[in-house]
Amino acid sequence: MASAIFVLNLKGKVIISRDYRADIPMSVVEKFLPLKSEVEEEQGFSTPCLTHEGINYIYIHHNDVYLLALSKMNSDAMEMLVFLRKMADVFIDYFKELQEESIRDNFVLVYELLDEIMDFGFPQTTETKILQEYITQTSNTVKKHAPPPIAMTNAISWRSEGIHYRKNEVFLDVIESVNLIAAADGTVIQSEILGKVRLKCYLSGMPELRLGLNDKVLFEAAGRTIKGNTVEMEDVKFHQCVRLARFENDRTISFIPPDGEFDLMSYRMSSNVRPLIWVECESIVHSGSRIEFMVKAKAQFKKRCIANNVQIIIPVPEDADSPRFQTSNGHVQYAPEQAAMVWNIKKFAGGKEFFMRAEMGLPSVKNEDIQVQKKRPVQLKFAIPYFTTSGIQVRYLKITEPKLNYHAMPWVRYVTQNGTEYSIRQ
């Protein structure tokens, strides 16, 4: 529960505010920045939750603004932080950019949104699709249509009633991003899998969906066995449509989905991951005038799978020139802005090996410079459809609509791709 919401600039000046409960003086916001600076100086780090004289200051920082909630109650700080994050997402959906200028340019719209997303200090709806049915923006003005959508007052705020499709379909994508750092000898230094289940729902009415995965915890709790592998997910996060109480009780993922595309859940796995594509790179310096690279790339995933649009980014000396390349597959480009050569392989089948040889001139490089250059790792980018590193599987996706009683077709796809860090040290 929040008593008031403020949007401040970096100097702590109020851009816009909304008092919901009138139980605290609005002037206390002036203490926010001094209090924040004092805590950072004492503790050596910042914290998103501050308390002073019985008032809680809960905030997030985005670009050049602070979104601040003040509360006199003993509120759930995490709940308020999630609300502020979702409020920021709503503003971004409306303005494209959340910054001081966009807030000032859309004062009327911001006030309308603040009135709808919170009522008497209690969060209401932060689903942009629902808000856009009620509040629309044209040339920085707001048009309000009555009556409000039923979803605004429903328990199911993320979905409107009366949705109809001629063809009822659900597309489910399991997307896994692999972060990996490996040493030159093949030892995996660090690895993790970040996964998400993304749905595109084109379903009429108010459908009930149940999703079954090869969840290890589920089968152990039920004392059942399953043919094939099971997976143990960590840090699982769900969209608000998922019935958490039921999941905690019997691990069933049941929900009434929003219309269109959304991320149903995300998860992490920290198990040791074998490099999906292994790269060995050897370089030889010839009399300080040129450098030669011998590169081998091997796909270490299942033979029936194919990696698409593989990029192998190999560092080279910054002032290397006159590149010449030979490769058994794909093509190589010199990227001087990255001080690297980029080996592009359109299709890389599992179990295959490809080779590349490169030769470049060294007009001014010194031996010690080359030693420093070797410390830069090889980076990889790729996407492998119909494959998951973790082995996660969708066992079933059941769709029921008790009133309309239609048959819907679910489509399931899998893809594994590189994460933000996929590198092999040389």
UniProtKB/Swiss-Prot annotation:
Give the principal location in a single coarse category.
membrane
Q: Which Pfam family would be a valid example here?
A: Adap_comp_sub
Name of the protein this chain belongs to: AP-1 complex subunit mu-1
**Record's Gene Ontology CC terms?**
AP-1 adaptor complex; cell division site; cell tip; clathrin-coated pit; clathrin-coated vesicle; cytosol; endosome; Golgi apparatus
Q: Which PANTHER family does this one have?
A: AP COMPLEX SUBUNIT MU (PTHR10529)
Family matches, as CDD domains: AP-1_Mu1_Cterm, AP1_Mu_N
Q: Name one GO biological process term.
A: Golgi to plasma membrane protein transport
What role is this protein assigned?
A: Component of the adaptor complexes which link clathrin to receptors in coated vesicles. Clathrin-associated protein complexes are believed to interact with the cytoplasmic tails of membrane proteins, leading to their selection and concentration.
| Source species | Schizosaccharomyces pombe (strain 972 / ATCC 24843)
Alphabetically, the GO molecular function entries are: clathrin adaptor activity
Q: How does it sit in the membrane?
A: Peripheral membrane protein
Tell me which UniProt keywords the record has, alphabetically.
Coated pit, Cytoplasmic vesicle, Membrane, Protein transport, Transport
Where does it live in the cell?
Answer: Cytoplasmic vesicle, Clathrin-coated vesicle membrane; Membrane, Clathrin-coated pit
State the oligomer form and interacting partners.
Adaptor protein complex 1 (AP-1) is a heterotetramer composed of two large adaptins (gamma-type subunit apl4 and beta-type subunit apl2), a medium adaptin (mu-type subunit apm1) and a small adaptin (sigma-type subunit aps1). AP-1 interacts with clathrin. Interacts with sad1.
What family does the database annotate? Belongs to the adaptor complexes medium subunit family.
- Coiled-coil-forming residues are none
Q: Does the keyword RNA-binding apply?
A: no
Q: Which residue ranges does the record assign to the MHD domain?
A: 167-425
Tell whether Protein transport is among the UniProt keywords. Answer: yes
